[in-house]
Design a protein with these regions (language model features):
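Core dinuclear metal-dependent hydrolase active-site scaffold
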Residues: 1-50, 113-201, 257-299
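Active-site environment of divalent metal-dependent phosphoester hydrolases
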Residues: 11, 32-34, 60-65, 87-90, ...
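Active-site metal-binding motif and surrounding structural segment of the metallo-beta-lactamase
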Residues: 25, 33-87, 196-212, 223-230
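Stable alpha-helical elements in mature extracytoplasmic
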Residues: 35, 39, 64-67, 92-102, ...
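Divalent cation-coordinating acidic motifs and surrounding scaffolds
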Residues: 56-60, 64, 82-86, 92-95, ...
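Metal-dependent catalytic neighborhoods of phosphoester/phosphodiester hydrolases
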Residues: 65-74, 90-100, 217-220, 241-246
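Long, structured stretches of catalytic cores involved in phosphate-ester chemistry, encompassing
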Residues: 97, 197-260, 264-269
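Active-site regions of enzymes building and remodeling cell-envelope glycoconjugates
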Residues: 106-109, 117, 245-252
């Protein structure tokens, strides 16, 4: 069994995966003074006892690294996964300064399409001979030889744009869930690389760019993934791309607030921190592991 948690952090992203193996994964950071103590406390508690912890930064846009310095000071990031980049910003926040420190440190591992790493997607023993198991995470993008991607890396180096250096992350739990994150990839860029990314049936898709119209997913990708649920981020209603996915079930984070996915063999049970949130496409299996169960789905 594993737990996927999507925090409600406004116009930003922050997640963790508590794996059934000896792994704990955090994806992106968006903290504020009013939420940071509670979120950090939860992450500290949930990662207790895990031998391998990693933080994956999809890209260095401000709402994905917000208060990363505070988070790192409190949690202590030991393994920092990011795409290889030389992003700069004219006005450097403490968050971006910490991102650069981690990016350029010995803690960094540069992710790319098809990369292998022990305990990320390879099993193996630790230095004491203990078998830790794989996290089930694979990186589907970027292809670092792709010319369109190289152009986006240059924009990041010039400090003009960062969204399209986002990596695509896939998490697979054996006989259970497949989930995909796409950072803040934008529609035009996704269209330019749509034949370069190998996707498959997906149960939970976290919509790129917080569910904005600017992150509309290519139809070819949607057809291939055929997601059971698309989680729409907290984009403003005027920017939301909700109407572009009429044939897919959706959970709106701006209504559901924190979303917890309890993933077990053949099933995903879903909980919302909003006790009044409902999702009529889910079945009721009367689960109660967490507060405010909203339903389950077969996977």
């Amino acid at each position: 069994m594993s737990i996927i948690k999507s925090f409600s952090v406004g116009l930003g992203d922050m997640y963790y995966i508590k794996h059934g193996s000896e792994n704990f994964t955090m994806i992106d950071c968006c903290l504020k003074p009013e939420n940071r103590e509670a979120i950090v406390k939860e992450i500290k508690e949930e990662k207790k006892g895990k031998d391998i912890t990693r933080f994956i930064s999809t890209h260095p846009d401000g709402d994905h690294i917000q208060q990363l310095d505070y988070f790192d000071d409190e949690v202590e990031i030991l393994n920092f996964y990011c795409v290889k980049n030389e992003a700069t910003k004219t006005s450097e926040t403490n968050s971006f300064k910490r991102y650069c420190e981690l990016r350029d440190s010995s803690k960094a591992f540069n992710v790319f399409k098809g990369c292998k790493r022990k305990w990320m997607n390879d099993d193996g023993p630790d230095s004491n001979g203990k078998e830790l198991g794989s996290s089930g995470i694979n990186i589907l993008w970027p292809d670092t030889s792709n010319e369109e991607y190289k152009a986006e890396l240059q924009k990041a180096k010039d400090g003009t744009a960062f969204n399209n250096i986002s990596c695509i992350i896939q998490y697979k739990l054996k006989n259970s869930v497949t989930a995909v994150w796409m950072g803040d990839l934008e529609t035009n860029f996704m269209e330019s690389i749509k034949d370069e990314v190998s996707l498959q049936k997906t149960n939970i898709l976290f919509a790129p760019h917080h569910g904005r119209k600017s992150g509309k997913i290519p139809q070819e990708w949607l057809d291939t993934m055929n997601p059971d649920i698309i989680v729409m981020g907290e984009a403003n209603s005027k920017d939301s791309d909700y109407a572009s996915y009429p044939n897919h079930n959706k959970i709106r984070q701006n209504s559901a607030k924190d979303i917890t996915f309890e993933c077990e063999s053949g099933k995903v049970h879903i909980y919302s921190s909003n006790e009044n949130y409902t999702a009529d496409f889910l079945t009721n299996e009367n689960k109660s592991t967490f507060d405010y169960y909203i339903g389950s789905m077969d996977v």
